[in-house]
Amino acid sequence: EKHYAPNCRVELVETAADAKRRQSELVSENQKVQILDFLGDVVSYANQLYARLRQADQSGIDVVIAVIPINVGLGEAIRDRLTKASAATNL
């Protein structure tokens, strides 16, 4: 599958706590926010990544905050895709 570049902005964070903090900031700015976090389940993350980004676009989400997985194995591939999605939406 080609790299999907969502219409919403994608921001990357290291931890769920960082995601919650950033969500609070964005919600206070009247942004519609979704957190993308699979709690360390990289297989589910990989399988659902593009579907969740498309769903965010269809739901009118302004910003997706993605908790990035560890940079090993499948996690590395997910990080690469999220980095590309983030770069494409933060120009």
Positions of the model-derived regions?
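A C-terminal functional module that forms or caps the active site or interfaces directly
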Residues: 1-91
